[in-house]
Design a protein with these regions (language model features):
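C-terminal motif of bacterial Sec signal peptides marking the signal peptidase cleavage site
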Residues: 32-34
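Sec-dependent signal peptide hydrophobic core
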Residues: 16-27
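Long, compositionally biased, charged low-complexity segments
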Residues: 8, 18, 47-51
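Intrinsically disordered, low-complexity, compositionally biased regions/tails
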Residues: 10-11, 27-29, 38-43
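N-terminal secretory signal peptides that target proteins for export/translocation
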Residues: 1-16
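Electron-transfer interface patches adjacent to heme c in soluble/periplasmic c-type cytochromes
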Residues: 38-56, 61-309, 313-415
Length: 415
């Protein structure tokens, strides 16, 4: 059995066990409902588990053939091989999966016997599939390990690690936005860019990416969003452009990352075709299934004041008027409506991110797990939850007392 299929089979088994423990029928019904389907069409639990496992493999390891962009166009394999040692990689927010490291290497790192200042060490980590979201082909050329191809996966931006081994090194946390990652700084290293291009990308800053920049030439990045807690939410992007994850996954895979396939968006007069072979479409169902299985993380024990959070819930539903839009179990009205740009606390901005989208509007962001991913608002203009509350209080003339504002922050931290 090929290694990739063996990994999928193993992961399918991991998914089937909890489904069986919870009751297969209920689990299947919940999965179908989450995908916008109908329980009238029975779905085999084992098949769904395999689909989720395949999606996990896609999320972590599939580049959709984007090596043609990152290698052939941007020449990032040359940059990595010559200038990106592990310490440099960690400094721009790249993460290392400690579970991909053999025990002997872990011991050597702990003993200080591994040189983390040499690009050759990065190549060794790539050979192990240990650099989260980066897929490299390392071949021996004239007796020397050589990085010949490099591509990226969904996990680059939408996964991080728990830092259990060291900062930036630990177990994967899929779905968690990597707000340490500085994709603009990484792209700016490309020798294929001119000075203006390098400056534009370098201006983004950590945790931000502009998914329209290479389409409309404008430069106004947004924060990397979570890829968890999306079960049951149909408008999955800041601007609600598509009604399912597969829409945005295709757009990013092809239009942004250079994956081999086609994406069309008539509302933007957009048609992008990379290559003649479609390496994207067949992977979208599994990828979506896996992402919908990712739950928002619960807040750490002791991270908020329980009594204050209870009072804050009353503020959230009352004086703060938050539940007017942040409603329902997902704390969003995104399945019902979108909002004009003027409703956004990040607007007015220039250029307006909404104006560059297909809907020209914003969705209400879901709040589960909000404690985990500062900064806030789509442009990252609020550094803390206290800043979020203060902004709403001022812009909406809510007249919250200091105690109400503080309690509301504690409630948000509890979600």
């Amino acid at each position: 059995m090929p290694a990739r299929r063996r990994r999928i089979a193993d992961r399918a088994a991991d998914v089937v066990r909890p489904l069986a423990a919870a009751g297969v029928g209920a689990a299947v019904a919940a999965f179908v409902a989450a995908c916008g389907g109908s329980s009238e069409a029975p779905v085999d639990a084992a098949e769904q588990a395999a689909l989720i496992a395949e999606g996990k493999d896609t999320f972590r390891f599939d580049t959709f053939g984007d090596e043609r962009f990152w290698t052939d166009t941007l020449k990032m394999h040359e940059v990595i091989a010559s200038a990106v040692d592990p310490l440099t990689a960690l400094s721009v927010g790249l993460k290392v999966d400690s579970e991909a490291l053999p025990a002997s290497l872990v011991e050597a790192i702990q003993a200080g016997a591994v040189d983390l200042t040499k690009p050759a060490t990065t190549l060794a980590l790539l050979r192990l599939d240990a650099v989260v979201g980066v897929k490299g082909t390392v071949e021996t050329v004239n007796g020397v390990d050589t990085l010949t191809r490099v591509g990226i996966t969904c996990a680059l931006c939408h996964s991080t690690v728990d830092d259990s081994f060291a900062r930036g090194i630990g177990k994967r946390l899929d779905g968690w936005p990597n707000r340490d990652l500085d994709p603009g700084a990484i792209i700016a290293l490309s020798p294929a860019l001119d000075a203006d291009g390098k400056a534009s990308y370098a201006s983004w800053g950590p945790g931000k990416f502009d998914p329209r920049h290479n389409i409309d030439g404008k430069n106004k990045p947004v924060v990397i969003p979570p890829a968890y807690g999306l079960d049951g939410i149909h408008s999955v992007t800041f601007t609600g452009d598509g009604t399912e994850l597969a829409y945005w996954n295709r757009y990013v895979a092809v239009a942004e990352m250079g994956g081999q396939g086609t994406v069309t968006e008539p509302r933007l007069n957009l048609v992008v075709q990379n290559g003649i072979e479609d390496l994207v479409t067949a992977k979208l169902p599994g990828l979506q299934a896996y992402q919908l299985s990712l739950k928002a993380p619960a807040p750490p024990a002791g991270s908020y004041d329980v009594g204050a959070a209870l009072r804050g819930k009353a503020v959230f539903e009352g004086a703060g008027t938050c539940s007017t839009c942040h409603s329902g179990p997902q704390f969003t009205d995104a399945n019902i409506r979108l909002h004009p740009a003027s409703d956004s606390m990040a607007e007015p901005e220039s250029p307006s991110y909404a104006s560059r989208s297909a809907t020209k509007q914003y969705r209400t962001s879901p709040l589960k797990g909000i404690w985990q991913h500062p900064p806030y608002f789509h442009d990252g203009s609020a550094a803390t939850l206290a800043d979020v509350v203060r902004t709403y209080d001022t812009r909406r003339s809510l007249g919250l007392t200091a105690q109400q504002a503080a309690d509301l922050v504690e409630y948000l931290k509890s979600l």
